[in-house]
Amino acid sequence: MTDHYEINTIGVLTSGGDAPGMNAAIRAVVRTALANGLTVRGIRRGYHGLLREEIIEMSGRDVADTIQRGGTILQTARSQQMRTPEGQLKAASILKKYGIQALVVIGGDGSFAGAQKLSDYGINVIGIPGTIDLDIACTEYTIGFDTAANTAMEAIDKIRDTSTSHERCSIVEVMGRDAGYLALWCGIANGAEYILLPEQHGYDEQAMINDIIEKRKRGKKHYIIINAEGVGDSINMAKRIEEATGVETRATILGHLQRGGSPTVKDRVYASIMGAKAVELILEGKTNRVVGYQDGHYIDFDINDALKMNKEIPEYQLDIAKIL
């Protein structure tokens, strides 16, 4: 059995937007902790639930038959109160009240920012990256991205079928307010004619319209445009393109469809290993870390350093997308 460094009780919560694979991570945290003699307290509805003391003790039975389920069994929510010093102090006090000596937070940058604030009040926090946006800079992988990308890819394949039949231009809006990884990967996987990303800081709509008109003259009959939600309104974009080109254009917003569904093998396995890694870090006495994956290895970063990192889409991926 691992040396516990006087740790006997840990907590786990999911925060922010849900992502497929979160249950696999929760399951791994609980099972690894129990295997090492720790007590696990699950916190429902993220920081919102923490501030309301929605805290339960978890057993192996609580995570049985959950690895294949989408969403999060602990549920999730966003909390404005947690953004305030008063809320952060209250949250830390509640954790101490329940004897929680270390907290595992599964979520994105916003969730990690909340965790970092808790560390200022003496709470040991360990972050696990869970977001379909793939926008956490310290890791090449985030829980949920693979499932969301596959869900979107399958939907776009179906949209192309009907777009081809009706000789239409189809705009498909995928999630990604500030990050375009989902749009880029789906654009490459689906052979989209155009991919619009927030990282491009705007796009030349007139050039795209001119290109559609020119390709129409050469005999091309259908088009797929992948639009990340942070770029602009897909419905009005469709109206403008149809008016300018004469090509019937429809917009489809995939929305929260991308967050649901049974996680892929990759999301289940990576989430499971990250969950186990988080508990191992606690048992090793490490504090205030974020679990990550880089170059084939599971690693960890100081949470303060992780939050300072910026993630940019590699130029070669953008270049490949233009060619393909």
Cite the ranges covered by each PLM segment.
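Accessory alpha-helical/coil subdomains and C-terminal extensions
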Residues: 105-107, 113, 117, 124, ...
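Flexible, glycine/charged-enriched surface loops at secondary-structure junctions
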Residues: 38-44, 162-169, 221-225, 248-254, ...
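Short glycine/serine/threonine-rich phosphate/pyrophosphate-binding segments
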Residues: 19-29, 51, 85-86, 100-116, ...
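Short, acidic/small-residue loops that bind anionic groups at enzyme active sites
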Residues: 41, 119-144, 196-200, 253
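Phosphate-binding loop/pocket of nucleotide- and phosphate-handling active sites
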Residues: 245, 289-324
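Glycine-rich oxoanion-binding loops at beta->alpha junctions
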Residues: 2-3, 50-103, 110-111, 143-150, ...
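N-terminal phosphate-binding or glycine-rich loops at protein starts, especially the Walker A/P-loop
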Residues: 2-51
